[in-house]
């Protein structure tokens, strides 16, 4: 793989500087503490033009590649993965609309998204359909030119925010396997019959994780993305982008966890010297930085392969697996280094730790990633 060229280095530095100065760790901490969606931060990202980074120029976007996007996600995840989630989850559906949406859908949804006036959420999981996502029970039937939807969805990120269109996986028919007969419907979150409840989760407190109840909710027949029955291929097509993006954001958050722990180790005086002078702390910090650097390289490799349209299912799974477990590990070690101070919200480490705990679950569990890797090894 090639390491960053001059323009990529400039772009990465620009994102990090923007997040430090315009978003700030204090703002992200406040959103987390108050369980408040980061509307102001999201709007700043939109005004900077970054929401249209991946959108093709033909659709009014910048036509950037997935490597550029990974660098952006690394930066937006700097002070917490949750903020990056607000940006990423919208982009995943936007790209599905780019690839599969009708001309009318692209005109209706993409321009407001790029301007930051609307956002997207993805709804796949259900109470009995997590990793086994094709076991979808939520059903949509076509009645008098409308899809009538009944069921329940779970673990939907950002669905309760204002002006959200939900890309929802539903069952519209039957087939030889459970992967057939699935469709994706674009459902505004203020649709009558749609009830959304924020869940009091350990992590992702700002963007919000929700459950959705659908009681004969109705949307036009034209709300289907692509064609009926194409849902499984559409919803899984974005997984490569999603896993590279979240892995990059994990790396950004993990690096800050190391930086914060290192700064504390310099400032904290015990037994008449800074605690970093104790070898046990130096070794902990050395291991933490090594893990983050290794995770970053795996992410950059996966992103560079994807940008070159090279098959990289295995490399993407490795990046997601290692980056998520790295965030979990270094945030836990950061908590140990900060001691009692780490338990306080203003230290931020406890937020990184909470995000680290969900990182090995969301976007495909570590066990699923290992299964993908093992399959690529023919074992």
PLM features: residue spans?
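Short Ser/Thr-interspersed hydrophobic loop/turn segments at strand-loop and sheet-helix junctions
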Residues: 49, 72-77, 170, 187-192, ...
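Alpha-helical interface subdomain recognition
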Residues: 1-79, 83, 100-105, 112-117, ...
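Helix-loop "lid/cap" segments that line or gate small-molecule binding pockets
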Residues: 91-100
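A short, Trp-centered hydrophobic/proline-enriched beta-strand micro-motif
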Residues: 116-124, 168-169
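Active-site-adjacent elements of ketosynthase-type condensing enzymes
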Residues: 128-137
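A short, charged helix-loop
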Residues: 210-237
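A short core secondary-structure module
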Residues: 146, 150-195
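Flexible, small-/acidic-enriched active-site or ligand-binding loops
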Residues: 135, 190-218
């Amino acid at each position: 793989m090639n390491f960053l060229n001059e323009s990529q280095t400039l772009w990465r530095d620009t994102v990090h500087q923007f997040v430090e100065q315009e978003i700030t760790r204090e703002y992200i901490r406040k959103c987390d503490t108050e369980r408040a969606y980061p509307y102001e931060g999201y709007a700043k990202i939109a005004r900077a033009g970054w929401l249209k980074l991946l959108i093709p120029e033909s659709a009014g976007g910048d036509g950037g590649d997935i490597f550029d996007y990974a660098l952006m996600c690394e930066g937006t995840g700097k002070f917490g993965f949750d903020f990056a989630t607000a940006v990423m989850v919208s982009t995943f559906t936007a790209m599905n609309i780019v690839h599969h949406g009708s001309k009318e859908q692209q005109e209706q949804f993409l321009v407001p998204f790029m301007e930051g006036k609307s956002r997207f959420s993805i709804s796949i999981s259900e109470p009995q359909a997590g990793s086994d996502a094709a076991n979808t029970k939520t059903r949509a039937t076509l009645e008098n030119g409308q899809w009538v939807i009944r069921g329940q969805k779970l673990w939907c990120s950002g669905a309760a925010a204002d002006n959200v269109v939900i890309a929802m996986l539903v069952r519209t028919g039957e087939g030889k396997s459970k992967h057939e007969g699935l469709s994706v419907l674009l459902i505004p979150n203020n649709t009558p019959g749609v009830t959304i409840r924020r869940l009091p989760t350990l992590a992702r407190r700002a963007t919000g994780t929700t459950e959705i109840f659908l009681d004969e909710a109705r949307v036009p027949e034209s709300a289907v993305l692509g064609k009926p029955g194409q849902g499984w291929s559409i919803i899984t097509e974005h997984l490569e982008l999603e896993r590279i993006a979240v892995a990059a954001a994990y790396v950004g958050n993990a690096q800050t966890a190391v930086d914060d722990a290192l700064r504390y180790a310099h400032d904290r005086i015990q037994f008449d010297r800074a605690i970093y002078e104790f070898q046990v702390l130096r070794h902990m910090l050395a291991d933490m930085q090594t893990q983050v650097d290794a995770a970053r390289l795996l992410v950059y490799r996966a992103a560079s392969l994807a940008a070159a349209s090279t098959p990289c299912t295995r490399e993407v799974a490795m990046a997601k697996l290692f980056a998520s477990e790295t965030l979990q590990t270094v945030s836990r070690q950061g908590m140990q280094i900060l001691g009692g101070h780490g338990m306080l919200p203003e230290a931020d480490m406890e937020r990184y730790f909470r995000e680290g705990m969900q990182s090995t679950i969301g976007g495909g569990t570590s066990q699923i990633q290992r299964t993908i890797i093992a399959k690529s090894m023919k074992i």
